Amino acid sequence: MRDPLPEYPWDAMEPYAALAAQHPEGALNLSVGSPVDPTPAAVREALAHATEAHGYPATAGTVPLREAIAEWFERRRGVTVEPGAVLPTIGSKELVALLPFLLGIGAGEAVVFPRIAYPSYAMGAALVGADAVAADDPAEWPEHTKLVWINSPSNPDGRVFDVAALRTAVERARELGAVIVGDECYAEFGWDAPWDSERIPSILDPRVVGDDHRGVLSAYSLSKQSNLAGYRAAFVAGDADLIAQLLTVRKHAGLMQPAPVQAAMVAALRDEQHVAEQRERYRVRRETLRSALEYAGFRVEGSSAGLYLWVTRGVDAWEAVEELARLGIVVGPGHFYGDHSPNHVRLALTAADAHIAAAAERIRAAATLAA
C-alpha cells in the first residue's frame, strides 16, 4: 500500500480562522485564491444553452472548444498549436496532481518542481511513489527526472520566467529525456515592468522552442481570468504525441469535462473584454493592499505577476499569521509552499473590493497605533 498522504495544509489554518472570526468587524479571508467576482454573463448563458447534455461528453473536447483553445493560444500567447494538440482538463489542479500517473511515472523516477511551490506538484509525485525534487536550477535536476514543472507566473511568489530562462529549462529537460510542463494559469496578470506591458512568455513560445513542441506542454486554467473556478475549466496543449497519450489514459479513466462546461469555455476564450475588466479589478486591489502592507513594515518580494502578494517582515510565518489573524485577517503561511519560505506569508487578491479595503485599513490602523 502507498504511504499515508500528509494532511491537507489548509486544515492547519482552523485555529487562526477561529481567532480572526473573533474580530468585532468580522473575518477577512485572504488565504485562498478562490475568485469572488461574477462569472461573465455570456459564459453563464453559454452554459445554460448547453444543458441538454444527455450523452457522455467528448474526452478530447468538442471541435469548437479545441478550435477556440488553439485560437486563444495564437491570439493571447503568440503560440501556434493545432486543435488536435489540445486537451480539456477538469480544472488544472487535477492535471497537476494526476500528470505523473497519466504519463506512467513511478518509483525510481523523479518529478521536479519549484523550491517555493503550491503543494500539488509534490502530491502528484507522492501519489505514484516517485521522488519529489524541489529545485529551481536546471543543473540540479537529477538524471532520473521524468517530469519537470515550471510555474510562471508562480504561485505563491509571482515569479516570471523570461524567454531565456524558459529556453534553458526546456533544453535541460530534453537532455534528461523528461517531459516539461509550464503551469501558466496566471499569465494574464502581469503587474511589474516589463510584464505590465509585455506578454508573459509561454513555455511553447516560438522564441523558446521554435516550432518543436517535442516533450513540452503548457497548462492553463480559466478559473482566475474568467472567474470559473466552480466550472473546473482548464486545458493542456503542446506535444501532439503526449496529448494523444494523455487522451488515451483519460478515456480509460473517465476523465471527461462536462459538455456544458466545454460550451462555456468557448464563450470565455473568445471574449477578451471580461478578462481586461477582471485584470483591472485585481490591479486596484493589489495597489490598495500593497500600500498598506508596506506602511506596516512588510516587504513585498517577487509578486511581479499573479494574484498574490508574497510578503515578509523577517519573523516566522506562523507568527505573522497570528498577528494578522488578531486583526481579523486570514493569510497563508510560507510553510505551505515548501521548506524554503519560513518567514513569508501569502495574501490573495481574490476577495471583494470592500474586504480588501477593510483589510488594508486594519493593517494601517494597527501599524499607526504601534508606531
Regions found by a protein language model. Give the residues of each.
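A glycine-/small-polar-enriched, mobile loop at the entrance of the PLP active site in fold-type I
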Residues: 28-36, 48-67
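Conserved donor sugar-nucleotide recognition element shared by glycan-biosynthetic enzymes
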Residues: 9, 13, 62-65, 92
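The alpha-helix within a helix-turn-helix
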Residues: 70
